[in-house]
Amino acid sequence: MVRERTKKLRGGHYGRGFKAGRGKGKKGGSGNAGMGKHKWIWMVKYDPLHFGGKGFTSHHISQVEVPINLGDVEYMYESLKRDGFVREENGEIIVDLRAAGYDKLLGNGNFTVKSTIIIDKATEKAISKLSAIGSKIENDGSSA
């Protein structure tokens, strides 16, 4: 009489029925196969960022304003003069902050030199402080 073979639980694939899970045939694909089909629930629970965009790249080139305070203009006055951004025309001192790389004049601090400042934008506080000492602001050829 031949002894019957025992069904050994080979490997870690227990609880899958007779001979199921012993070979390669019932794994549902390897790796990320089936993420959008039969592994969808697993993916939603454990890897929710698997599908979909990861943000976007803005192709709009925005121009960043470079501000400067009145107090900083006072502090940097000599270096601006040395670098050629302060000149004198017809007895009037002209400070060209636009050429120096600044876009906006802010009103923090004090400026004591009576002059014409060339810059694109200025705050109301900066304009009032400059007009109090007799200075003026020009942007694009027109005074502000």
UniProtKB/Swiss-Prot annotation:
Alphabetical UniProt keywords: Ribonucleoprotein, Ribosomal protein, RNA-binding, rRNA-binding
GO cellular component: cytosolic large ribosomal subunit
Region (Disordered), start-end ranges: 1-32
Single annotated GO MF: structural constituent of ribosome
Origin: domain of life: Archaea
Compositionally biased region (Basic residues): 1-13
GO biological process: translation
InterPro entries hit by this protein: Rbsml_uL15_N, Ribosomal_uL15, Ribosomal_uL15/eL18, Ribosomal_uL15/eL18_sf
A Pfam family reported for this protein in Swiss-Prot or TrEMBL: Ribosomal_L27A
Entry keyword annotation includes rRNA-binding: yes
Function: Binds to the 23S rRNA.
Family: Belongs to the universal ribosomal protein uL15 family.
HAMAP family: Ribosomal_uL15
Oligomeric form and interacting partners: Part of the 50S ribosomal subunit.
PANTHER family to which the protein is assigned, alphabetical: 60S RIBOSOMAL PROTEIN L27A, LARGE RIBOSOMAL SUBUNIT PROTEIN UL15
This protein's name: Large ribosomal subunit protein uL15
Species annotation: Thermoplasma acidophilum (strain ATCC 25905 / DSM 1728 / JCM 9062 / NBRC 15155 / AMRC-C165)
Phylogenetic placement of the source organism: Archaea, Methanobacteriati, Thermoplasmatota, Thermoplasmata, Thermoplasmatales
Recorded name of the encoding gene: rpl15
